[in-house]
């Protein structure tokens, strides 16, 4: 009886450690994905002197910024299908 209980405890410990590894790998994959998205070259629009002016040049963007006098589209709007 004691051997059965100890075996069950060992099996549960192994399953718990494997699930922790799976969670760690999944969170690492999310970090990689978000890093890849940040590396995408942003769209660039016309000249600007401040951020609000960029919405006129980049109407399809959710977030625009004026970077070094040029409008940069950071997140493009994609309509739902």
From Swiss-Prot:
One GO term (biological process): defense response to fungus
Cell location: Secreted
Main location: secreted
Keywords (A to Z) from UniProt: Antimicrobial, Disulfide bond, Fungicide, Plant defense, Secreted, Signal
GO cellular component, one term: extracellular region
Signal peptide: 1-26
Disulphide bond pairs: 48-66, 54-71, 58-73
Family: Belongs to the DEFL family.
Protein name: Putative defensin-like protein 265
The organism's taxonomic lineage, starting at the top: Eukaryota, Viridiplantae, Streptophyta, Embryophyta, Tracheophyta
